[in-house]
């Protein structure tokens, strides 16, 4: 039942938020800056206009508020950054993105 709710929630997301989830699901690194770069590249490939970093981060906060991601503060070298962790199976975001953009 939880899987069905997650699938419905992801299906109802706007394209930008879906691409953010896809980038988080398929990126080797879970650091926010790396996920943002993957998100931007995907948008450019598909002819979508990417969010600015500020709007990207705001949309990540929205995704956290609906329970799809968790942002975890992490110290890297001497600076603090966030990691993005999905709260569901990454293959769900990958398959829904593939269906919507191909």
Model-derived regions, located:
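Winged-helix-like regulatory helical subdomains adjacent to P-loop NTPase cores
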Residues: 1-38
